[in-house]
Amino acid sequence: MIQRRRPVPFELGPVHFIGIGGIGMSGIAEIMIRIGYTVQGSDAKASANTERLEKLGARIFIGHDAAHVEGASAIVYSTAVKADNPEMVAGRDKRLPLVRRAEMLAELMRLQFSVAVGGTHGKTTTTSMVAALLDAGGLDPTVVNGGIINAYGTNAKVGEGDWIVVEADESDGSFLKLKSTVAIVTNIDAEHLDHWGDFDAVKKGFQDFIQNIPFYGFAAVCTDHPEVQALTSRIENRRLVTYGTNPQAEVRVSNIEMGPEGATFDIIVSPRAGEAVRYDGLKMPMAGHHNVLNATAAVAVARELGVDAEAIAKGLAGFGGVKRRFTTTGVANGIRVVDDYGHHPVEIAAVLKAARAVTPNGKVIAVVQPHRFTRLRDLMTEFSSCFNDADTVIVADVYTAGEQPIPGVDRDALVAGLKKFGHRRALPLENPTALPRLIAAEATSGDLVVLLGAGDITTWSYALPGQLEALTK
């Protein structure tokens, strides 16, 4: 039985989550269970997330049926849930409150001071890093993340402190419902245009995200990114803390070195008023220039919240990472296999740069499962030119994510695009069962294989080391 940790304003019946196993939904559901709500929910299939919630006391339904919402007091849903879902239809018929995921997250944020982490890329890792530094500083935050934090074994936790750290999802514009005390913007790229319509609308969304903070709060923004730097000129009456590698950044990272064990770097803080503060010789067991920038954002926020230099260094050195962010799934015959969620060209390029940095004497072999036909169509040029740090690129079929195929936008089109843009070795993957033998033919001891995508390619990455071992027996 879970102890009720905070009072709720009314006695409510069960709160029903449609798609409760989703990474964003499951985190909110877990927090609500832990603060005293009765939670139930449905999903198309059982998963590690639904099993974890069931152990915490949630009632879980597999499949969707109108009968599941009997007795519910409210329904929480995400934009992935269609209007004709039988549970949505039943909820409307019963005149139950239908609450968007972000709206429920905003309700949880009202209970504490909050840090909301936004940006096209890097949100999940940066959220985890902020949480790690606040934990190291004794602030014991509540956390709602978009990925499994290895240190917690879950994507959410209830802390005893005054702060909540959340990942702010811009994909459907719902992050504008989050009224945070502190905001972070890591970068801004042309993504999720199916919702926003055009890039100007995306940029305006991030401007509003920052303007939503109160006068006593602040936003940490990465001015290494040109669109974020441009954004700073449009923000009025809100405090900004800039960070990056450039000399104009208030929180500047320098002397970055990559090695097999991760990154080392220095940070110097040069506030507009007051003396400069140095953090020299910081170590982080995570590769990639992009992750150093994510860590710099976390340092910028942590020091503003009162975390001292010793705790910051300890928190970074002990950072356990996030599942599906450059996660090593095994080593077979000297070949390292890595799983990564990267599915946008900017993310893929950053991951491959990190892979190259930690594999100085071996080959980098990328296996990519494009995610959504519309994304591949809209960014075909970018996808065709973002794999330069991979010696070999193996392209799988597109993961549909519920979309219908688009003529001329498929695996073979991307292979052709890679070759057109000058890649020397781009290969199609006929089916997942062919992957082990293809990797065995391409890779030797000392090489790194990274599997990229937001679909079910993650299951291939965990199976691959054992499959490679079996081929040599």
From Swiss-Prot:
Top-rank taxon, per record: Bacteria
Catalytic activity from the UniProt record: UDP-N-acetyl-alpha-D-muramate + L-alanine + ATP = UDP-N-acetyl-alpha-D-muramoyl-L-alanine + ADP + phosphate + H(+)
GO MF annotation terms: ATP binding; UDP-N-acetylmuramate-L-alanine ligase activity
Statement: the UniProt record of this protein carries the keyword Cell division: yes
Annotated binding of ATP, by residue: 119-125
General function of this protein: Cell wall formation.
The protein, known as: UDP-N-acetylmuramate--L-alanine ligase
Organism encoding this protein: Caulobacter vibrioides (strain NA1000 / CB15N) (Caulobacter crescentus)
